[in-house]
Structures are given as C-alpha cells and as structure tokens.
C-alpha cells in the first residue's frame, strides 16, 4: 500500500483560518484511493527530522505585526526546512507559512525579520489588508481555475528563480500589483489562499499529492479518478460569482 508521511507544522499556532482542512482533504483523497496518510503534528519544542516525511504543511497565523510567537521556528527547524526544500520534498505553505519560507518580512515600522530563505521571495507590510474571495489560474492545472479567500497585510514579491503559482483573475494575490499569486520553486506550493484551499480545488490537491508520491517512489504517478462533483460545483460557483468564467 502506498503511503505518504505528512508533517503538519505548528497546528496550534498556524491555523487561524481553518487551514488544517487541507490536511483532512489530502488524507481523505489518499484513503479514497486505497492509500495511507500518516500525519504527524510538530509544534514548539518538538524535534523535526525532515527525512521522516514526504509532505509538509504550514498554515496561516497572526501577522508579524501582531507579534506572532515563533521563536522555536528560527534555528534548527528553519535550517531543516530549507534543506528539505532543496531536497525537493513537497511543501504546501499558506499565508504566514508561505511568508516564513522567504528571505525576510519587513513590518510597517521598518523592522526586518530574517526568515528561512528557502524561497527567494520577500514580504513587506502594506497599509491596508488585502481581503476577500479571489480567483487565479495556473498553467499546471490547465483550464481549471483556483478559488480561495485572502486575508493578509503582507505584500510578497518574487525573486529570481521563483515562479508564481498562478495569475490573478480577480482579487489581489501576492501584492495587488503584478497579478502574481503564490510561488512555485522545486516542489514548494506557496499561496495566500485560505478556504480551506484544497477541498474546493481538488485538481490542485491531486497535483500536490501526485508530486509527493512521485518524489517518494521515484516514478510517474497516475492517480485514479474520484467523484469530485460536489467539490467542483463549489469551485465553479465561486468562479462564476467572481466573474471569472
């Protein structure tokens, strides 16, 4: 039986917007195909050995402006995560988790927080929150559009070697300026999309699952189809509501 070992980082501190639903989605989509998901939660004080896992998830939490408490992250865990990214382990990082993978975050007061440096991106605080339902398209997903809910003060800018996850059709995405949303580097999927994201974007969910299975087993993976009628109805409803057909 195929199995993915999933590491859920800081579920107690980085789950303000029900981003843990992404873990549930991945787990169920594996089980429905007769595969197994072994989920381990890693929080402050817990030892992290990235070699033990195939897929990593980091969710959204408080803004840096509001005093996010992640001192445990900086140091050994941060170095391990950077190593895992370069080793092409699969990551789904949402909002704060996405920002944490970058080079730095600069607050509205000009305070710079040096971060993981796993992605060549940086984030700066804006004056107003970027908030609301939004929609973007991704070359990896063909004609299927991705919908989510954004709620962030940070403006993220991509550097050399990093591609956007998608192009914004409605909403703000990374910064509200250049129409980019999220980031793709090696096997990292970074995004500002809450929702939770994956339950109403099953094609993206399977893209992430397939990437993790292929990385683990070293061969091309063709996932058996699932009945995604309800999931795609939810997706299409939001696409239509946002005027992105």
Describe the predicted segments one by one.
Residues 108-181:
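Pocket-forming structural segment of enzyme catalytic cores
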Residues 1-83, 199-245:
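N-terminal beta1-alpha1 cap of cysteine-dependent amidohydrolase-like domains
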Residues 175-211:
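A glycine-centered loop/beta-turn motif at secondary-structure junctions
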Residues 2-4, 141-146, 184-189:
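Beta-strand-turn-beta hairpins that frame and shape the catalytic cleft
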Residues 12, 153-155, 195-197:
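Glycine-rich beta-alpha junction loops
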Residues 63-140:
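Cysteine-nucleophile active-site neighborhood
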């Amino acid at each position: 039986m195929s199995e993915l070992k999933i590491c859920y980082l800081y579920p107690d501190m980085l789950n303000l917007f029900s981003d843990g639903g992404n873990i549930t989605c991945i787990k169920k989509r594996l089980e429905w195909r007769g595969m197994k998901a072994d989920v381990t939660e890693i929080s402050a004080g817990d030892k992290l050995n990235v070699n033990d896992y195939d897929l990593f998830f980091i969710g959204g939490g408080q803004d840096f402006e509001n005093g996010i408490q992640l001192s445990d992250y900086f140091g050994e865990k941060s170095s391990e995560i950077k190593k895992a990214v370069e080793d092409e382990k699969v990551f789904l990082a949402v909002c704060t988790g996405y920002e944490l993978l970058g080079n730095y975050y600069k607050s509205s007061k000009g305070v710079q927080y040096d971060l993981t440096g796993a992605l060549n991106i940086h984030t700066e605080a804006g004056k107003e929150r970027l908030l609301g339902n939004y929609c973007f398209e991704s070359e990896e997903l063909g004609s299927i559009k991705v919908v989510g809910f954004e709620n962030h003060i940070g403006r993220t800018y991509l550097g050399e070697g990093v591609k956007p996850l998608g192009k914004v059709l409605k909403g703000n995405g990374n910064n509200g300026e250049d129409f980019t949303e999220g980031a793709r580097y090696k096997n990292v999927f970074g995004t500002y999309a809450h929702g939770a994201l994956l339950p109403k974007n099953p094609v993206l969910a399977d893209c992430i699952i397939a990437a993790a299975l292929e990385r683990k087993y070293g061969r091309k993976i063709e996932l058996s189809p699932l009945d995604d009628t309800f999931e795609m109805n939810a997706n299409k409803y939001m696409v239509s509501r946002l005027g992105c057909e």
